[in-house]
Amino acid sequence: MLEARDLYCERDERTLFRGLSFTVDAGEWVQVTGGNGAGKTTLLRLLTGLARPDGGEVYWQGEPLRRVRDSFHRSLLWIGHQPGIKTRLTARENLHFFHPGDGARLPEALAQAGLAGFEDVPVARLSAGQQRRVALARLWLTRAALWVLDEPFTAIDVNGVARLTRRMAAHTAQGGMVILTTHQPLPGAADTVRRLALTGGEAGL
């Protein structure tokens, strides 16, 4: 379980949120919503330990995140707004970098992400959407319980969004957890996704 307790965050003397508390249990996914500058990416960075809140605490499995950072990161898949891939490598080589023991599974993961036939193309030659898919192919390889995804559908077409949404639904159905930001509707998932709205100051599920 991931838990936020009474989080407070301020940027440039402006309060992004205060008193923010919620939990994400096994089998749940949460969509963080809010306008530009509302603090969506900042919140994800706090939840992953990449930044510290100005007040409050994040907990993992009942322990303060700062005390269990190593075990937490073994349970985490974080994909930020930037793809975080190496443009000089091919799609296959990028996945191998993150998942060196899964060589036989790499082609299928890339196919699931819509990159069949592009496995050995240098990433620098791929479109922005295809580069995003290289990063998201990790969703078919990772064993992490918690997925935190910042705008995963950027530059992804409608069919790709549907495919990725189905993968997230399968992950939560197996007891995984998903937290994501997106401005796009989640096809077929409206009844299962909890929404956390950041509106400046207070926030609520």
Curated annotation (Swiss-Prot):
ATP binds at residues 34-41. One of its GO terms (biological process) is cytochrome complex assembly. Its EC number is 7.6.2.5. It catalyses: heme b(in) + ATP + H2O = heme b(out) + ADP + phosphate + H(+). Residues 2-205 form the ABC transporter domain. One of its GO terms (molecular function) is ATP hydrolysis activity. GO terms for cellular component: plasma membrane. The keyword Membrane applies. Pfam families: ABC_tran (PF00005). Coiled coil: none annotated. It is found in: Cell inner membrane. Keywords: ATP-binding, Cell inner membrane, Cell membrane, Cytochrome c-type biogenesis, Membrane, Nucleotide-binding, Translocase, Transport. It is an enzyme of class 7 (translocase). The keyword Transport applies. It is a peripheral membrane protein. PROSITE patterns: ABC_TRANSPORTER_1, ABC_TRANSPORTER_2, CCMA. Belongs to the ABC transporter superfamily. CcmA exporter (TC 3.A.1.107) family. Part of the ABC transporter complex CcmAB involved in the biogenesis of c-type cytochromes; once thought to export heme, this seems not to be the case, but its exact role is uncertain. Responsible for energy coupling to the transport system. The complex is composed of two ATP-binding proteins (CcmA) and two transmembrane proteins (CcmB). This is Cytochrome c biogenesis ATP-binding export protein CcmA 1. The lineage of its organism: Bacteria, Pseudomonadati, Pseudomonadota, Gammaproteobacteria, Enterobacterales.
